[in-house]
Amino acid sequence: VISERRHVACQSLVLSLALSLLGVAHAADKKPTNDKLPDWAPKPKPHVIEDRFRLEVMTLSANLDTDIRIDPNLATQGTLINAEDDLGLDDSKLLPLVELTLLPGDRHLIRLSGFSVRRSADQVIDKTIVFDDQTYLPGERVNSTLNLTSFGLTYGYSVVKTQRIDLALTFGVQIVEIEANALVRSRVVRDSETGVTPLPLAGIEGRFDFNDRWSFEGRVQYLSVELDEVDGSVLDARAALTWRMNPYLVFGLGYRDFHVKVDSRDIDDPGIFDMKMAGPLLFMRASL
């Protein structure tokens, strides 16, 4: 009898252990995974933070090349001059640049950008220059100023968005203001011109993540327009290698090329302005 009781007890113990193991296995099967988390569970951190706000501060070591011609009228052309060679303006400059990007959705971006190039020089010219309705003679000392200010508004939509690739089409407008001034103090000869031109842009930009830290970014915007009185074109391109310190802070080293050309046949401001600006770029981007 005792043997039978021990046998029954052993059978009960084995059955209880088996049921316990089945329960544990069943619970393990129902354990949530990262790809099937309940709504209340915290989601895993993304490969790159899905931010909604970016502030980018840049320094551009720009090489500058500027051709300019201000005509007295539509029938008479002025002198085409190179601002760096003929007027002595700086052909290189360290420029601060700022961009603010808003990301209202998973695939949308709105970017505000702007920069200013301000240069002045005092040089004795070696040729006759017709600038608007003034004539500057060889041997005269000319005080010149040439300023360019650019503001841009861009909208982008990501047509391809994966874990490592983000490719967007962009549309925007670049407002370019040009201010030119030339002064000969000995003859009290002075002329000043200002022009503002809005230029629409279309482009493409993208990012490829090599890993959690390193990425390659590139963008290009370009458009050429021909209106009744003004022809213009803008090219704004850049490429950069970036290093992500943490999900909120990125450092980058790249190259930027900016080229604006305006050919005006407007009766009030006829002439040509052609400026190329290119050089290495260092930037820091903060994300929130």
Placement of each model-derived feature along the sequence:
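Repeated loop/turn-to-beta-strand initiation elements of outer-membrane beta-barrel proteins
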Residues: 107-110, 163-165, 212-216, 247-251
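Extracellular/periplasm-exposed beta-strand and loop segments of Gram-negative cell-envelope proteins
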Residues: 65-93, 116-148, 176-196, 225-229, ...
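Transmembrane beta-barrel strands of outer-membrane/channel proteins
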Residues: 57-61, 112-116, 169-175, 206, ...
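Residues on the lipid-exposed face of transmembrane beta-strands in outer-membrane beta-barrel proteins
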Residues: 57, 98-102, 153-157, 171-173, ...
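Transmembrane beta-barrel architecture of outer-membrane proteins
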Residues: 52, 93-97, 148-152, 197-201, ...
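Bacterial N-terminal signal peptides
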Residues: 12-21
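Detector for outer-membrane/organellar transmembrane beta-barrel domains
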Residues: 166-168, 175-179, 187-224
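Short glycine/proline- and aromatic-enriched beta-strand/turn motifs that initiate or cap beta-hairpins
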Residues: 28-117, 281-287
